[in-house]
Amino acid sequence: MTHSQYIFGFHAITSRLRQHPDSIKEIYLDTNRHDQRARDLMSLAETTSTRLILCEQDRLCKMTGTTRHQGVAAHVTKLRRYATLEDLLEGLTEPALLLVLDGVKDPHNLGACLRVADAFGVHAVVVPKDRAVGLSATVHKVASGAVDTVPFFAVTNLARTLRELKEMGLWIVGTAADAPDTLDSVTLTRPLAWVLGAEDGGMRRLTREACDLLVSIPMSGSIESLNVSVSAGICLFETFRQHSQRTGSGLNVPAPKNAV
């Protein structure tokens, strides 16, 4: 099992430098980058005593497997902040909020879901080990640093994990277009895990059966379904909104800032 990987893109690498500089083995920067972003990255690398190597575009393409690396890549060790979900949940001082993704295969969707999870104070994102994308370099880039702030768990048996979460006191709520209950009709202030299905077929049968409740997202247009990251954003915002109304503040979310 490999414990290191390459990530790319200025947002992803800058976030890793600020959050976990010790996890970076070295940074590779396009020798032709002389702009402000490159200079800022070089300065931050120097401040954190991180090795930075100037190299050619071809080398960056081979490292990352893409031409869309923005001229920068980093060789990093994988982060591991909690041994188990149970460890994470036991340390919480507020109602747990998890995002469970069943079989999401598109790295852009997973990256966007992680970014949304960070925005609304999700305590962890959970995925199955098989038939789902992992934390690839593309996921790091799309997530814009959220990989470094949101704990991520890949589990062997998702349905069993959901049952274990129930035993730990979480309410398991899934989304389904045919669900009779709508998102805006449900109280979401208790500890819960949102479960969203894959881009093509939605939740698998055993995952769906493990849910305590299924809800649909009210829509008035002609499109029958939404991108999984859009659905995640809507569900998590409604959860955050209800927590804010109940307590005067949301979950563990930083002060509001302009969206990018």
Swiss-Prot record:
<dbReference type="InterPro" id="IPR013123">
    <property type="entry name" value="SpoU_subst-bd"/>
</dbReference>
<comment type="similarity">
    <text>Belongs to the class IV-like SAM-binding methyltransferase superfamily. RNA methyltransferase TrmH family. RlmB subfamily.</text>
</comment>
<dbReference type="GO" id="GO:0003723">
    <property type="term" value="F:RNA binding"/>
</dbReference>
<feature type="binding site">
    <location>
        <position position="197"/>
    </location>
    <ligand>
        <name>S-adenosyl-L-methionine</name>
    </ligand>
</feature>
<keyword id="KW-0963">Cytoplasm</keyword>
<dbReference type="GO" id="GO:0070039">
    <property type="term" value="F:rRNA (guanosine-2'-O-)-methyltransferase activity"/>
</dbReference>
<feature type="binding site">
    <location>
        <position position="217"/>
    </location>
    <ligand>
        <name>S-adenosyl-L-methionine</name>
    </ligand>
</feature>
<keyword id="KW-0489">Methyltransferase</keyword>
<keyword id="KW-0808">Transferase</keyword>
<protein>
    <recommendedName>
        <fullName>23S rRNA (guanosine-2'-O-)-methyltransferase RlmB</fullName>
        <ecNumber>2.1.1.185</ecNumber>
    </recommendedName>
</protein>
<keyword id="KW-0698">rRNA processing</keyword>
<dbReference type="Pfam" id="PF00588">
    <property type="entry name" value="SpoU_methylase"/>
</dbReference>
<dbReference type="InterPro" id="IPR029064">
    <property type="entry name" value="Ribosomal_eL30-like_sf"/>
</dbReference>
<dbReference type="InterPro" id="IPR001537">
    <property type="entry name" value="SpoU_MeTrfase"/>
</dbReference>
<dbReference type="InterPro" id="IPR029028">
    <property type="entry name" value="Alpha/beta_knot_MTases"/>
</dbReference>
<keyword id="KW-0949">S-adenosyl-L-methionine</keyword>
<dbReference type="InterPro" id="IPR029026">
    <property type="entry name" value="tRNA_m1G_MTases_N"/>
</dbReference>
<feature type="binding site">
    <location>
        <position position="226"/>
    </location>
    <ligand>
        <name>S-adenosyl-L-methionine</name>
    </ligand>
</feature>
<comment type="function">
    <text>Specifically methylates the ribose of guanosine 2251 in 23S rRNA.</text>
</comment>
<dbReference type="InterPro" id="IPR024915">
    <property type="entry name" value="23S_rRNA_MeTrfase_RlmB"/>
</dbReference>
<dbReference type="GO" id="GO:0005829">
    <property type="term" value="C:cytosol"/>
</dbReference>
<dbReference type="Pfam" id="PF08032">
    <property type="entry name" value="SpoU_sub_bind"/>
</dbReference>
<dbReference type="InterPro" id="IPR004441">
    <property type="entry name" value="rRNA_MeTrfase_TrmH"/>
</dbReference>
